[in-house]
Amino acid sequence: MGNHKAALTKQVFTFASELYAYGVREVVISPGSRSTPLALAFEAHPNIKTWIHPDERSAAFFAVGLIKGSERPVAILCTSGTAAANYTPAIAESQISRIPLIVLTSDRPHELRSVGAPQAINQVNMFNNYVSYEFDMPIADDSKETINAIYYQMQIASQYLYGPHKGPIHFNLPFRDPLTPDLNATELLTSEMKILPHYQKSIDASALRHILNKKKGLIIVGDMQHQEVDQILTYSTIYDLPILADPLSHLRKFDHPNVICTYDLLFRSGLDLNVDFVIRVGKPVISKKLNQWLKKTDAFQILVQNNDKIDVFPIAPDISYEISANDFFRSLMEDTTINRVSWLEKWQCLEKKGRKEIKCYLEQATDESAFVGELIKKTSEKDALFISNSMPIRDVDNLLLNKNIDVYANRGANGIDGIVSTALGMAVHKRITLLIGDLSFYHDMNGLLMSKLNNIQMNIVLLNNDGGGIFSYLPQKESATDYFERLFGTPTGLDFEYTAKLYQFDFKRFNSVSEFKNATLLSETSTIYELITNREDNFKQHQILYQKLSEMIHDTL
């Protein structure tokens, strides 16, 4: 028994130390019995912060938010059985978004697998469709090889925690009873750092000269790291190229004449220009209309992503580069320039007139977009916005026009689950205001527990149209009229004031845009600001804006 405890202690303390060595500073633990050894090891480590969340699904999304906020890998730990399966949505989001989430599932020892033991399911390779690397660790024993396996496996897995190969990894860890390590053996807990991998590549720019020397070019930038924007702006300035900047690109923070923000509304309202080449940077953009245009255009398309697995949506490019945006554009700098002034001025004219139409619209609108416009005005440069999927991110795409605020969202799998938890994870490291719809909020209300337990401050702006507003913009609205409200509108009639009381949030309800205009978003407390809207009215008012922009485009071109 003594040998077992010593072996278990050395294994889990070594494992915790190795995670620290590769940059882990936070672990989110969901309580359970089988995870006892590692939970105690993390709790005992002097330089690892532990978070406790009883719901595995929300815990995993909370960790995703921690990673977004800290830009470091974060580990999650749960007990054996179906607890692990609840991690799946967040792992899928992490895989598509290249988020270094370290998944640690505790397991029954091998002799208790597939024999009917309680809380024992097949956990080996259970996430293999969504993780970059996985390994079923050996059980603790006295052999040197068991400890060496930790060193070897962490070294292999570390390539997926940094650089272009980033993504979630999974370690399944079986533990045999008794489960308590020796908490006095703290000398085994170390805080040494490994040399982390560094990735940088250059390109042969000569292969692109004949393409980039053409006049009508665009730079389209999706979700990407804020550290990569400098060279994009420099290249755009030198070569007179418009930048169509997604709200998650971090480029709308800059008051730069080449940054185009109204493109979604312009394409939605009938814009269709001939283009020679497109440089696509980062993840796919949010705008459905821009993605549809990319699918049909004859322009030569260059894709730049700092990933080992290129996301080609909405269409495969003519050529792609696995390289950072800064390195790519730095490689293209040359002495000669192309005169594209008239091409750039055409886009700048459309942008200026588009902004004017949006401003006039917002001065009179009473729908959700008017609420979103007011929220953007109220958000200070010290704060960041986390935007839920569905309609909120689309309204922000249309209405965020060059303001120095950071915008974040879960745009990997684009799901509505785990939004509250992800935003709260980010709120640990940044001042965050969450913009979310009522169905997305309902889906992750239990995520609010982390705010209550840990005093994490975050304001929530809740757009409540009592259902799924985005479906009003889809063909189902007209083709399935008799069934639409039951199958797609899905009203719930929930009173979210009770949710606020349950999780000790302040609560304010606004029934009109004029009421919200006079409100102050407090930074000292956690408050839910509920904005009551109407789905049908939202749809009708959006159509008015599209028509105004369509007329503007017709008069301009």
Swiss-Prot record:
Cofactor binding note of this UniProt entry: Binds 1 thiamine pyrophosphate per subunit.
Cofactor(s) it depends on: Mg(2+); Mn(2+); thiamine diphosphate
The entry's keywords: Magnesium, Manganese, Menaquinone biosynthesis, Metal-binding, Thiamine pyrophosphate, Transferase
Enzyme class: transferase
GO biological process, one term: menaquinone biosynthetic process
TM stretches of this protein: none
GO molecular function: 2-succinyl-5-enolpyruvyl-6-hydroxy-3-cyclohexene-1-carboxylic-acid synthase activity; magnesium ion binding; manganese ion binding; thiamine pyrophosphate binding
Pathway: Quinol/quinone metabolism; 1,4-dihydroxy-2-naphthoate biosynthesis; 1,4-dihydroxy-2-naphthoate from chorismate: step 2/7; Quinol/quinone metabolism; menaquinone biosynthesis
CDD domains found in the cross-reference section: TPP_PYR_MenD, TPP_SHCHC_synthase
Family: Belongs to the TPP enzyme family. MenD subfamily.
Assembly with partners or alone: Homodimer.
Protein name: 2-succinyl-5-enolpyruvyl-6-hydroxy-3-cyclohexene-1-carboxylate synthase
Species this chain originates from: Staphylococcus aureus (strain JH9)
